[in-house]
Amino acid sequence: MNSLDDKNALTKEARITRKRLLEAAEELFAQKGFDGTAIRDITTKARRSPAAINYFYGDKRELYEELFRLRLREMCESRLNTLKTVMSDKTKPTLEKLLYAYSVDFIKPFLDQQQSQRFMQLFFREMAE
């Protein structure tokens, strides 16, 4: 393996580690809250070293904030794409179509996959605390 292959492998491993940390953190923060979740809990669930959080995020607070930034960015992009699709229709979109597109996309995280439901649980936990 040459050095470029080594670099790509490390980059791939780094992406996997970041993803595992985020997924583990999201699940645990949703269940236990920020204060109830220890770095060790996250890294054990992600099967990574506790140093990985410091390396990739700095600390638990930064990981928590990155999780919110990532999920909220995904939600915003989804809503914008849905509205762009409706707006790009050859005919002038009706108010009904616009409201339907927006509201369906707004409700989707409540009905969608487990990850979206975990984030909604985390989101409401944060709002309540």
How would you name each of these model-derived features?
Residues 28, 74, 109:
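Short alpha-helical functional segments enriched in proximate histidine and acidic residues
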Residues 112-129:
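Amphipathic alpha-helical segments used for helix-helix packing
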Residues 45, 70, 122-126:
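Short acidic/histidine-centered micro-motifs embedded in hydrophobic/aromatic stretches
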Residues 26, 107, 124-128:
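Regular secondary-structure segments
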Residues 15-23, 35, 56-84, 100:
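An amphipathic alpha-helix adjacent to DNA-recognition modules
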Residues 81-116:
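Hydrophobic alpha-helical connector segments
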Residues 28-67:
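Helix-turn-helix
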